[in-house]
C-alpha cells in the first residue's frame, strides 16, 4: 500500500478541489496513459487495486508507472459517536486528483493490450477516465 514514510502533521484540512490539474497532464514516462476527467480523492487501496488489475491483464509484461501518490491523510470518527469532542483518528491516505491529471502510464505493450489494461484499471477508480497516447496529450482532457 502506498503511504508517506513520515509526515509533519497527523491531520490535514480537507481542502477544495476546484479547477484543473496544474501539472502532470501529459504522458511523460510511458506510451499510453489514463487521464482523469473528474476531480476526486483516490485512496491508496483504489490505486493498488487498479495497479493489480493492470499488471494481471498484461501478464507482468510491459512497465507501469503510477503518477499519483496518496500523501493526504483522511480522518474518520468511529460509528455511533456523538458530534464534537475533536477531529477523528487518521483512517487512511488519499491522493487529490483533478481533471486532466495522468494517473497511470504503461509502456512495452501493444495499444490494444494497454487500452484494455487501463480500462480495467479505470473500473477500480471512482471517477471517469480517458485513454491517452503520448503524442495526443496537449493538457486538455
Swiss-Prot record:
The keyword Metal-binding does not apply. GO terms for cellular component: cytosolic large ribosomal subunit. One of its GO terms (biological process) is translation. It holds the Pfam family Ribosomal_L16. Belongs to the universal ribosomal protein uL16 family. GO terms for molecular function: rRNA binding; structural constituent of ribosome; tRNA binding. Binds 23S rRNA and is also seen to make contacts with the A and possibly P site tRNAs. The lineage of its organism: Bacteria, Bacillati, Bacillota, Bacilli, Bacillales. Keywords: Ribonucleoprotein, Ribosomal protein, RNA-binding, rRNA-binding, tRNA-binding. This is Large ribosomal subunit protein uL16. InterPro entries: Ribosomal_uL16, Ribosomal_uL16_bact-type, Ribosomal_uL16_CS, Ribosomal_uL16_dom, Ribosomal_uL16_sf. The keyword tRNA-binding applies. Part of the 50S ribosomal subunit.
Amino acid at each position: 500500500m502506498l503511504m508517506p514514510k513520515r509526515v509533519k502533521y497527523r491531520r490535514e484540512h480537507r481542502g477544495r478541489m476546484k479547477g484543473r490539474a496544474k501539472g502532470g497532464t501529459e504522458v511523460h514516462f510511458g506510451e499510453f496513459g489514463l487521464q482523469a476527467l473528474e476531480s476526486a480523492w483516490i485512496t491508496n487501496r483504489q490505486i493498488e487495486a487498479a495497479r493489480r488489475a493492470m499488471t494481471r491483464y498484461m501478464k507482468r509484461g510491459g512497465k507501469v508507472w503510477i503518477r499519483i501518490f496518496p500523501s493526504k491523510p483522511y480522518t474518520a470518527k468511529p460509528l455511533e459517536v456523538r458530534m464534537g469532542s475533536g477531529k477523528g483518528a487518521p483512517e487512511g491516505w488519499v491522493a487529490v486528483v483533478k481533471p486532466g491529471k495522468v494517473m497511470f502510464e504503461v509502456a512495452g505493450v501493444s495499444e490494444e493490450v494497454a487500452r484494455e489494461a487501463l480500462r480495467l484499471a479505470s473500473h477500480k477508480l471512482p471517477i471517469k477516465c480517458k485513454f491517452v497516447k503520448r503524442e495526443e496529450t496537449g493538457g486538455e482532457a
